[in-house]
């Protein structure tokens, strides 16, 4: 308890009683230090706690609860005039030593960007580097362009208009239905290679939840989200939403009771 308190994971009384508060503190420590999360201060966790590599607690700020988590999909679209309040150019705020921002015009929500910095710092501490942000905020107009381009490609292959639109919706959101409109969704990649199966993808899927992010489109949730799995697409929902969704194996629709 004393060591957990020193590192900021525990704020209760140091009394030697391993109760619920201590167990939750151990779980939080394990999550933020890359350990198996079981809430038990066994040998591996104990050794980590007293090592030089033990990290101080990282608390990611959560935006206004009235705004988070925001559900955006075909059933809950945003309007053509929707624009997030606090967008920043990621090139201006993301340290190049941690991550490459693919385009100079890529924007994102400021709080989400700060959470990403914390996440990539943790990844670097674990020896995982080479990250790239390929997409962030998209306007309604830009999403319309992407949607129309994909429909045109299918039409060129001989699809009917109806089938081209249906096929497009498996991988490209309708204008207004894309999470990228929020500024809270990002495509994380590795330059020059397929992301799936890389050490970066594996690390991201294990640890992003601890920094307020979720893997938004997963294989076992395709029937609920309406999208094919995208291992590169993360969405900021803030803590504790992200860890609750992970621990309960819920996608955003399920978590908000919309499934």
Language model features by range: what are they?
Residues 2-3, 7, 20-27, 31, ...:
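Extracytoplasmic cell-surface/polysaccharide-interacting catalytic and binding patches
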């Amino acid at each position: 308890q004393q060591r957990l308190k020193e590192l900021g994971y525990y704020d209760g009384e140091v009394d030697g009683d391993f109760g619920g508060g201590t167990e939750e503190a151990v779980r939080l420590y394990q999550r933020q230090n890359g350990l198996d999360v079981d809430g038990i201060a066994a040998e591996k966790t104990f050794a980590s706690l007293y090592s030089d590599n033990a990290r101080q607690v990282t608390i990611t700020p959560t935006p206004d609860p009235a705004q988070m988590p925001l559900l955006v999909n075909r059933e809950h679209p945003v309007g053509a005039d929707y624009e997030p309040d606090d967008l920043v150019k990621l090139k201006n705020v993301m340290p190049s030593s941690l991550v490459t921002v693919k385009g100079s015009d890529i924007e994102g929500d400021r709080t989400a960007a700060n959470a990403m910095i914390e996440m990539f710092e943790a990844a670097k501490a674990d020896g995982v580097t080479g990250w790239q942000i390929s997409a962030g905020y998209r306007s309604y107009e830009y999403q319309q362009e992407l949607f129309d381009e994909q429909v045109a490609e299918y039409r060129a292959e001989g699809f009917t208009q109806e089938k081209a639109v249906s096929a497009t919706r498996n991988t490209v959101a309708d204008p207004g239905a894309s999470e990228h409109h929020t500024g809270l969704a990002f495509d994380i990649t590795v330059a020059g290679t397929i992301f799936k199966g890389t050490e970066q993808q594996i690390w991201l899927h294990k640890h992003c939840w601890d920094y307020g992010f979720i893997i938004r489109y997963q294989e076992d949730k395709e029937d609920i989200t309406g999208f094919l799995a995208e291992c590169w697409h993360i969405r900021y929902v803030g803590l504790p939403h992200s860890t609750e969704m992970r621990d309960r194996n819920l996608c955003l629709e399920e978590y908000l009771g919309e499934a």
